[in-house]
Structure formats: C-alpha cells, structure tokens
Amino acid sequence: MPDNPTGTLPEIILASASPRRRQILSEMGFIFSVCPSQAELYPDGSVAPAEFAVLNAQIKARDIASKYSNGLIIAADTIVVDDFGILGKPSSKKVALNYLSRLGGKPHTVISSVCLLNTENGQIRSATCQSTLTMRPYTQAEAQRYVDSGLPMDKAGAYGIQDKEFNPVENIQGCYLNVVGLPACTLVRLINEMGFNPKLARNWKPEGDCTLCRIYRTEISRLR
C-alpha cells in the first residue's frame, strides 16, 4: 500500500454525468465534484469485453486529469455483453428496441470497470466487477413502451435494473450496484489500495443483496 500516513482523501472528482453514479457516491457519504469526460471508445471487437471496459474507464479518467493538480478522479464504464457482443448505450430508439429484443428472456453479463487516478502523483488503479443477469420474457409491446418513455436511452444495454415499472430483470447473480453502474465494494477497495481510508456514511446500506456480499461485510463494514 502506498505511504500515506493520514489517509486523508484529496478532492474527489467524478468523471461521469450519470445520475446513478452520483447518487451512489452521495449516499455512501462522499463529497465530490462532477466533471464529465467526453472521451469514449466504441467497441470494434478488437479486445475482450472486460479489457474494453477497463480501457474506457482509464481514458475517461485521463481525459480530465490535467484540470486538477491534486485530486482523486473516479471514472467508470459499464457494458452489457450477450452472446453476440457488447451492448453500450443505444444510439437511437430503434437500436434500444433491438437491444431489448436480444436480451429478453435470456442471460447476459454486466461488466463495470472502475478507474481511480491520483492527479498529484499519477498513480492509477483499475478493477472490474461482473454480474450475470437473466431478463424476464417481456413482450415486444412492453419493450416498445419502455423505449418510448426515454428511460433506456442513457443506459448500457438499453435498460436500468432500477426501473421498477418495466422491471426487466428476473434474476441476478452478483453485485447489484455493479449493474446500476458503480460497484461500491470495488470502489472502496481501489481507494484503500491507493492508501486512503474513506469514512462512509453510517446509515448507508447498499441496494439489492449487496449486504450479503463477503467484501461488503469485511471491507465496507470495517470502514464505517
């Protein structure tokens, strides 16, 4: 672990415009500013999905690093992967409907990569988290109504597990917050590896089954 006697966190900058990531960080008790990165790779099949997510998160972190002399940048990238490849954010309603048709009633994987960059010394850490989900067999009409609502348009795979009205997910194995877009345990582990000791909000409790996670019990509970 890097030498850091106080473990005091520098200014935290979230390199994402995602309201879900902002909500997770806020509920965990972090004080941070937001500077969305505009940098992004597009999948071309040249690298494995997990590596693609890592590269995208790192590019986002480096994209805004020059704006801060002493900050801890948090960047993340979430992708959905089915048997045919990577599904990012849909570029149109037609694409969103196609994604939902591909996923309906079938299993797929959600990968989130988190990248932390300390702008003071250039230290960088990345890690990925994966969850396996099975979608319920929704109808084409249900999918069309969901697309028409506009909710899927800013989400990888064209759905949000937290969108209760559509309620697309039948089963999840793995981290719930990973599917939302920012796995809390992965984030805390990376912050700790960089020599910082975050103090989380005492009343914070992750959504889904995260409280059953071994890492949550041993790492996050220890840092309260």
Curated annotation (Swiss-Prot):
One GO BP: nucleotide metabolic process
Residues forming coiled coils: none
Protein name stated in the entry: dTTP/UTP pyrophosphatase
Active site positions: 77
Primary location: cytoplasm
Role played: Nucleoside triphosphate pyrophosphatase that hydrolyzes dTTP and UTP. May have a dual role in cell division arrest and in preventing the incorporation of modified nucleotides into cellular nucleic acids.
Cell wall biogenesis/degradation among keywords: no
Organism expressing this protein natively: Dehalococcoides mccartyi (strain ATCC BAA-2100 / JCM 16839 / KCTC 5957 / BAV1)
A GO CC annotation given for this chain: cytoplasm
An MF annotation (GO) of this entry: UTP diphosphatase activity
